[in-house]
Each structure stands twice: as structure tokens, then as C-alpha cells.
């Protein structure tokens, strides 16, 4: 009898928070959502809530990977491949999410209209980022087929691309978080979704702050060609907030190598 009562008490204790997590944000008894809305939300969260932020994180903080003997080992393309794959996949998921909702949204409230405007802005930003990447210009440099190139010479075209690409990308990620929160509220999503997304975004911000403080946001130019002033781009100011440059000695000291 005592064991039965203890089991019942444990079940009740576990059922209460679980029921709270499964309940909609409004506290309604039931939650109903159209299939197209559910798939729209899943694809947008996959794209703008997961893949695109991770791709941006890889590009900002992993141009030199742990254990890489920079500047003896230059141009590690792991970050580039990760960034490109996740950005293309994220924009594809975004586009499919837009297609799922095309012509089906009927919300006329202020929150729904704001969500729609932000959503369209994010789609335009995503497509613009892909187009900008394709039009970023040539690479150049000692290891390329041609020495002269937009990136190696840091031409005005390349500088403009970097300024727009970096600022638009991070602004879009911040707006995506707001848009996703609005979507959860409009759909009256289960509370567990809000909890999971809150934990995810908190972890993302914490990782960003930690990596930034560690000085891992390294100039792309230096990561590719090294710190020598013989390379023209190293004689120009860095592009972007919080971007670091290192001498060979400073990087070795930071990495704990002699």
C-alpha cells in the first residue's frame, strides 16, 4: 500500500510539469494547428533558428581551428565548407518554409502582420546573402591561379561585400529570433517549444560571447594569407566589429606554444 501511494505521488509530481510543458502558451486546454503551419514553422526554425546561425558562428570564430599551427598552416577551409553548406541548406529550408505558407496565411492582427513583414524581410536577406556570396569577386593571392584578385587586393568591391555580408547576416539572425518568438505566440505553440528555443538561443549567445572574449574572431585575410605586411590586405584596416589581427608571436603566445 505504501509503495502504491509513493508511486502515485511520484507520478503526480512528474505529470504536473509535463502537462504544463505540453499545454499551449495561452494555457488553453487543446492546441490545434494546420499541417501547412506546422511545416512552415519547422522549416523556418530549421533554417533561421539553427542552420544559418551555426553557419555564421563557424565563419566568425573558426577560420583558424584548434590545433592548427598558424601561420605555418594557412587557409584551412573547414570553416568555409561548413559555412557554405549550412548557409545554402538554411536558405533552402527557408524557401521551402515560405512555399508551405504561400497564400495560406489569414492572420490580420498586428502580431501576424509584423510576423509576415519580418518573414519577408528575412527571405529577401537570405537570398541577398547567397547572391552577394556568388558576386563577391575573385580570390587571388600567391596560391591562386592569378595573384591579383578582389580578396587578395582588398578592392573596394570586396570591402563593400564584407561590410554588407557581415552586418546584414548578423542583423538578420537577430531579427529571426524575434520573428520566431512572434510565430510561437501567433500559433499558440506548446510551452516546451518556447523552453527549448529559449535554451538554444541562450546557449548560442553564451557561445558567441565566450568565443569573442577568447579572441577567436580572426581576420579572414590573415587566416588565409598570414600576418605578413607584404600582403596588401594586411596594410588596410580590418572590416567588421570585433575582428582581431595577430602577429605570429602573439598567436603562439595566445595558443600556449613556444
Placement of each model-derived feature along the sequence:
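Membrane-embedded alpha-helical bundles that constitute the cytochrome b-like, heme-associated redox core
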Residues: 2-258
Amino acid at each position: 500500500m505504501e509503495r502504491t501511494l509513493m508511486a502515485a505521488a511520484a507520478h503526480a509530481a512528474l505529470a504536473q510539469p509535463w502537462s504544463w510543458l505540453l499545454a499551449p502558451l495561452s494555457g488553453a486546454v487543446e492546441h490545434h494547428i494546420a499541417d501547412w503551419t506546422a511545416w512552415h514553422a519547422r522549416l523556418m526554425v530549421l533554417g533561421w533558428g539553427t542552420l544559418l546561425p551555426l553557419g555564421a558562428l563557424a565563419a566568425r570564430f573558426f577560420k583558424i581551428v584548434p590545433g592548427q599551427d598558424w601561420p605555418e598552416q594557412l587557409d584551412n577551409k573547414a570553416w568555409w565548407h561548413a559555412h557554405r553548406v549550412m548557409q545554402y541548406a538554411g536558405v533552402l529550408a527557408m524557401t521551402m518554409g515560405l512555399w508551405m505558407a504561400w497564400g495560406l496565411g489569414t492572420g490580420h492582427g498586428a502580431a501576424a502582420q509584423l510576423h509576415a513583414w519580418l518573414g519577408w524581410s528575412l527571405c529577401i536577406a537570405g537570398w541577398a546573402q547567397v547572391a552577394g556570396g556568388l558576386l563577391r569577386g575573385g580570390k587571388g593571392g600567391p596560391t591562386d591561379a592569378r595573384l591579383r584578385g578582389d580578396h587578395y587586393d582588398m578592392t573596394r568591391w570586396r570591402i563593400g561585400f564584407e561590410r554588407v555580408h557581415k552586418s546584414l547576416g548578423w542583423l538578420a539572425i537577430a531579427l529571426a529570433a524575434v520573428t520566431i518568438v512572434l510565430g510561437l505566440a501567433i500559433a499558440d505553440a506548446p510551452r516546451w517549444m518556447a523552453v527549448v528555443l529559449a535554451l538554444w538561443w541562450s546557449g548560442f549567445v553564451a557561445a558567441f560571447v565566450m568565443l569573442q572574449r577568447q579572441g577567436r574572431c580572426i581576420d579572414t585575410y590573415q587566416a588565409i594569407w598570414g600576418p605578413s605586411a607584404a600582403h596588401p590586405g594586411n596594410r588596410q584596416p580590418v572590416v567588421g566589429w570585433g575582428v582581431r589581427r595577430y602577429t605570429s608571436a602573439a598567436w603562439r603566445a595566445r595558443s600556449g606554444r613556444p
